[in-house]
Structures are given as C-alpha cells and as structure tokens.
Amino acid sequence: MATINQLVRKPRKRMVDKSDVPALQNCPQRRGVCTRVYTTTPKKPNSALRKVCRVRLTNGFEVSSYIGGEGHNLQEHSVVLIRGGRVKDLPGVRYHTVRGSLDTSGVKDRKQGRSKYGAKRPK
C-alpha cells in the first residue's frame, strides 16, 4: 500500500485497454480489396476447410478475414467490407467479411438468420 506522500510524488498509472481489432482504427467497418482468397484448416479438435481472404484495407493495413456462410463469390481484386470478430479456431483471423455488401454476395437459399448473411427475404 502506497503512502499519500508516495502517491503525491508519483500518481497511479491508468490501465490502457488494447483493441481486439486494431486495423479498424475505432471504426465499425472498413473497406478493402482482396489480395488472396484461400481455404485453411482449423486448430486441433476441429476439422474443416475454412474460407478466408487476405484483405488490403483503405488505411494500409493487410488483414486476414473470414468469409462466413455456404459458398461465396469472392476472388482477387474483389472489394469487400470488413467488420471485427475473430474466428476462435483460426489463429490470426480477427475479422469477418460482411456478406451482401459491395462485391460480396449474400448467401443463397438462406432462410434463417438472414441478416447476418445478407440474404433477402424469400417470397
């Protein structure tokens, strides 16, 4: 326990909280261009081919972003919108692509949870 005199001489340090999504620079989303679209395998207990793209953002950052949903139309030079949100079983993937905006199509034949995948309401 510090004495009052010690605290007068040297006040307590404030804790600085580190951002989980530094490339967004306090913005809700960021636009970027795909530099590489590929699949990768998840960490130990899980097994799949997860769809991921490498994106060069408008602020100069280059990040890996997960493409959610079944099937996608992304290729190199596609313009995408990136939001925060990591993928727990893919190390280094801390962003998600927003489906149904810019060059990213929505998920086809999606009936439930449509807003998360940019799918229109079925007639």
Curated annotation (Swiss-Prot):
The modification 3-methylthioaspartic acid is found at residue 89. SUPFAM superfamilies: Nucleic acid-binding proteins. Pfam families: Ribosom_S12_S23. GO terms for biological process: translation. GO terms for cellular component: ribosome; small ribosomal subunit. This is Small ribosomal subunit protein uS12. HAMAP family: Ribosomal_uS12_B. Belongs to the universal ribosomal protein uS12 family. Residues 100-123 are annotated as: Disordered. The keyword Nucleus does not apply. It comes from Pseudomonas aeruginosa (strain ATCC 15692 / DSM 22644 / CIP 104116 / JCM 14847 / LMG 12228 / 1C / PRS 101 / PAO1). Keywords: Methylation, Ribonucleoprotein, Ribosomal protein, RNA-binding, rRNA-binding, tRNA-binding. Disulfide bonds: none annotated. It comes from the Bacteria. With S4 and S5 plays an important role in translational accuracy. Part of the 30S ribosomal subunit. Contacts proteins S8 and S17. May interact with IF1 in the 30S initiation complex. GO terms for molecular function: rRNA binding; structural constituent of ribosome; tRNA binding. Residues 113-123 have a biased composition (Basic residues). NCBIfam families: rpsL_bact.
